[in-house]
Amino acid sequence: MGTPNIENLRELVEFMAKSLVDNPDNVEVDEIPGQQTTLLALKVDKEDLGKVIGKQGKTAAAMRTIIRAAGTKLNKRYHLDIVE
């Protein structure tokens, strides 16, 4: 596996989310570059929101940790935001 780039991180978030939800066709990831931090906005079906967040937010926290770790390799900051 090569060095991750923003397209791979977007695809990674999309893959993780689609693996968790009942409605994978409604998963969408938007990338919003900023000056210091790139935001990855994850949109899922309202009924799948709990599955992506997980008990006590553990699933969402794990996804954010993976994204931050990949960003560290690129010397960039990434933030995962889960929106309805």
PLM-predicted stretches and their roles:
Residues 1-51, 66-84:
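RNA-contacting regions in translation and RNA-metabolism proteins
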Residues 53-57:
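Glycine-centered tight-turn and secondary-structure capping sites
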